[in-house]
Curated annotation (Swiss-Prot):
Note: The porphobilinogen subunits are added to the dipyrromethane group.
Record family assignment: Belongs to the HMBS family.
Pfam families given in the database record: Porphobil_deam (PF01379), Porphobil_deamC (PF03900)
Transmembrane domains' residue ranges: none
InterPro entries: HemC, Porphobilin_deaminase_cofac_BS, Porphobilin_deaminase_N, Porphobilinogen_deaminase_C, Porphobilinogen_deaminase_C_sf
Gene3D superfamilies: Periplasmic binding protein-like II, Porphobilinogen deaminase, C-terminal domain
GO cellular component: cytoplasm
GO MF terms, alphabetically ordered: hydroxymethylbilane synthase activity
Cofactor binding summary note: Binds 1 dipyrromethane group covalently.
Keyword set, alphabetical order: Porphyrin biosynthesis, Transferase
Stated role: Tetrapolymerization of the monopyrrole PBG into the hydroxymethylbilane pre-uroporphyrinogen in several discrete steps.
Cofactor(s) this protein requires: dipyrromethane
The protein's name: Porphobilinogen deaminase
Amino acid sequence: MIRIGTRGSLLATTQAGTIRDALIAAGHDAELVIISTEGDRRADEPIADIGVGVFTAALREAIADNVVDAAVHSYKDLPTAVDPRFMIAATPVREDARDALVARDGMVLGELPAGSVIGTSSPRRVAQLKALGLGLEIRPLRGNLDTRLNRVSSGELDAIVVAKAGLSRIGRLEVVTETLEPVQMLPAPAQGALAIECRAGDTALAQLLAELDDADTRAAVTAERTLLAELEAGCSAPVGAIAEVVESIDEDGRVFEELSLRGCVATLDGSDVIRASGIGSPDRARELGLSVAAELFDLGARDLLDERGRDT
């Protein structure tokens, strides 16, 4: 029996349930084990105030203590610093990485009147929303997805911004009033992706889990998280990134794959947003992440990050 650790929220158990079901379909016995995390217990506090790994540390300790054999993480929640006790055995096919607006009366972002109250606690979303100059009032937003959605339907908030992937996984895409394109709002690095983690020495389990790995997703996430790690910005910093494997045609008419990466660093008040992009080979995803991070530094990203205090 493969014991899969997961947080207890509907979204987390749904995500982990897809992994359990895939393993069972492949002929392996698997079950979910619910693990309570610091982020769940302190649901009313800003994530940045709780610390690094608020949703992942307890899951990792459960792996280390042999309470579970593996854990399913929202990849964007994992610290970028490598922990030698563990390995990412698989990165399954990614859901839509983009952010989604859920607004009253079916409105899109540009239709919200100045002064509208929009909920999000992500510094990345706050910074990019402010940079759009729409005159929105932004308020902190924590809690599970249903709780957040209820704050719009109850009239407490005019709109919220959340990850589209989460709404997709719990079957609530009908509430989305606008999918925010990366030109409006770059997603968090690894948003929409899952990481299946196990003990570093558990090679038999790692090989089994690797059947669920998607090479394009792994390449994209590697580029995005390398950029984040190089910036030493932490998962709650105002940093956005999205990478995609795309098809190109060479001068001889042959189709080949490239990896594109876009990244941004912003001030918390949205007064300055620095953007950079690059293209490379999917099998050199890390190098692409380093290259785009270097370009961001050349454009002044270090000063923007130093303003808020750097957090690894």
